[in-house]
């Protein structure tokens, strides 16, 4: 490991995942969506860090955790331009971008107060009908919602 990495304010990650370029205002929603509070590994969360692209950003470093695409793509609903760096032996071995999945299970609340998911104990299911603009449609009542209208469960 180089001297430069040892001098970082936050320790370099030996193995694990770095989730970067999270808009600061969405950081804690991303933490919730990933279930970070349930994890037993070392986790570092950086909030309001300087960013050339975003002005301010959030970052999450999770030691010894490697997400499957399904787990990580959930966050595309709130943070569509997040970057993932897969770290092994202090080196970035893979870079990924989140991708909007075709369906969202139990993540989004339906905006229709008469929808069965708001009146019965059942999980929500949305079909993504426009990935670029994040427009989703409820499987049960067919109510469409745009990203700015979405409420996360």
Curated annotation (Swiss-Prot):
InterPro entries: Asp_carbamoyltransf_reg_N, Asp_carbamoylTrfase_reg, Asp_carbamoyltrfase_reg_C, Asp_carbatrfase_reg_C_sf, Asp_carbatrfase_reg_N_sf. Binds 1 zinc ion per subunit. Its cofactor is Zn(2+). One of its GO terms (cellular component) is aspartate carbamoyltransferase complex. GO terms for molecular function: metal ion binding. GO terms for biological process: 'de novo' pyrimidine nucleobase biosynthetic process; pyrimidine nucleotide biosynthetic process. Zn(2+) binds at residues 110, 115, 138, 141. The keyword Zinc applies. It comes from the Bacteria. Pfam families: PyrI, PyrI_C. Keywords: Metal-binding, Pyrimidine biosynthesis, Zinc. Involved in allosteric regulation of aspartate carbamoyltransferase. Contains catalytic and regulatory chains. Belongs to the PyrI family. This is Aspartate carbamoyltransferase regulatory chain. It comes from Bacteroides thetaiotaomicron (strain ATCC 29148 / DSM 2079 / JCM 5827 / CCUG 10774 / NCTC 10582 / VPI-5482 / E50). The lineage of its organism: Bacteria, Pseudomonadati, Bacteroidota, Bacteroidia, Bacteroidales.
